[in-house]
Amino acid sequence: MFGLWGLLLFGSPAVLSGTVAADAGIEYDSNPARVPSDGSLGVLPQGSPLVRGLWSGSLAYAGPKQRLRLSATTTGKVFLTSEQQQQNVLVAQLGYEHGAKIGRSLIVGTIDYYDAFQADAPQYLERDFRSLAAGGRFQSVRPLEGGHRIDGVLHLTGQLFHYKPDPLQSFVGPSLFAKLGGRVHAGDPELGHDFDLSVHGRGDYRIYGPVRRDVFVSVGGSIQWQGPLLIQVGYSAQVNLSSTELESYQRHLPMLKLAFHLPGELFVTMKGQLNLQKSALGLTVPIQSIDEDNRSLVLLDLERPLPKGFAISARYCGYFSLPADGTSPYQRHTALLNFSYRFAR
């Protein structure tokens, strides 16, 4: 792969392309251990500053028919207080895609690997996990007159999720994802407005072991308008049906996103999402869960591009549980100042 990167940097065929990205930032996290706010796990949230970094790269080959893409990402967090050193984490991700173009369609085989390595911590505060997914994806785009477009994706994978602290939370099984979208262009061909519509669905069958089986179903849609600013409204409904008592639930996820450009090359993104969950009393949200997927969310992001691919950004995220969730009260706030670099060829 390093040889291919050399070709890319110092003179390569037009069919080769690649990207490099690097981030470094300082952040404050009010709840690094992601524990309930009421101390029900025997520990209360304790904030800490941290430094974080990310490196990622991708290399793609596009021939007359063949398509190939390799990607790698590594990221990590190091907390600056001794009490939160056990939340230090290093993450590695690898991706591989190989497929063929048939007309306006693409058929691709995919492999995705994710592994997190957390510092030693009590088992109830560990959240590192490993996942592997392999399968195939079909996608197609049909351009229409006037700048309109229809596109679709169908992705079937087999997935393995290994929760390292507790094998009973690990599962294996198939997953099917489908998405249908379209773009409607209005006004001037170059300066007009775009309306993007999409609907999506996902179904998983998860085998947790000899006694537990879950069926997870998610459906939703979004509409986005992009002109002088971007406005997106979305909604998802999720149902988890489990053979284990207390693990079934349903939730509704309305979302609103707003992005715009201020004078001085300042890009602003705001997002809010509610997690309206209904379940039997006693449902727990494992701390290894991703907050963006399992909590109500408020986000504010400011980014200022700099010359030669650099940028500086600031981001606030707040994660909350709602009283109607039927789960332990939860709050987490993060504030990040980040420097980034992007290169593409």
Predicted regions and their residues:
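Bacterial N-terminal signal peptides
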Residues: 1-11
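Gram-negative and organellar
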Residues: 13-345
